[in-house]
């Protein structure tokens, strides 16, 4: 059993028999004498994908979820589902279409990922924080645009579109932050 003092971002707890990933924790001190500290959490139910808020009293106990993280690899898209392989056991898992649609723009065949398993079932896939992708379509280079804060839209090899600096051309590899879909630099 865990107490609220153990809560931190990234911890997976069990609420209503579902694994829930803690996204944010805020400890709120009492304003009146005798009141207890409140622990406000924002979490994602890993079975449904819902993001919810819940407030606990300091010292409340919760069960830690039977959640395991494994090194994995993205193999291929099977229709609208993704197929992943556990790098330790070579077991293959399919990810549902709704969850896969969110991370697919960051994945190329063979990309290493982190698989989240709950009761031997795939419930989450974390792509690398930074991926290298090739620009397949973007407007032509704008002359003398190196010192400006302008951006232009670029389409990458996975179909992802994002804003990039105006000096980038088709065929260039760039680094993309998968947490907020942001251009970082040339690869």
UniProtKB/Swiss-Prot annotation:
CDD domains: S1_EF-P_repeat_1, S1_EF-P_repeat_2
Organism listed in the record: Geobacter sulfurreducens (strain ATCC 51573 / DSM 12127 / PCA)
Coiled coil start-end: none
Keywords: Cytoplasm, Elongation factor, Protein biosynthesis
The protein's name: Elongation factor P 1
Superkingdom of the source species: Bacteria
Annotated GO CC locations: cytoplasm
Lineage: Bacteria, Pseudomonadati, Thermodesulfobacteriota, Desulfuromonadia, Geobacterales
Associated pathway: Protein biosynthesis; polypeptide chain elongation
Keyword Cell inner membrane: no
HAMAP family (UniProt xref): EF_P
InterPro entries the record matches: Elong-fact-P_C, NA-bd_OB-fold, Rib_uL2_dom2, Transl_elong_fac_P/YeiP, Transl_elong_KOW-like, Transl_elong_P/YeiP_cen, Transl_elong_P/YeiP_CS, Transl_elongation_fac_P
Compartments where located: Cytoplasm
Primary location class: cytoplasm
Alphabetized SUPFAM superfamilies for the sequence: Nucleic acid-binding proteins, Translation proteins SH3-like domain
One function term, GO molecular function aspect: translation elongation factor activity
Function: Involved in peptide bond synthesis. Stimulates efficient translation and peptide-bond synthesis on native or reconstituted 70S ribosomes in vitro. Probably functions indirectly by altering the affinity of the ribosome for aminoacyl-tRNA, thus increasing their reactivity as acceptors for peptidyl transferase.
Single biological process term from Gene Ontology: peptide biosynthetic process
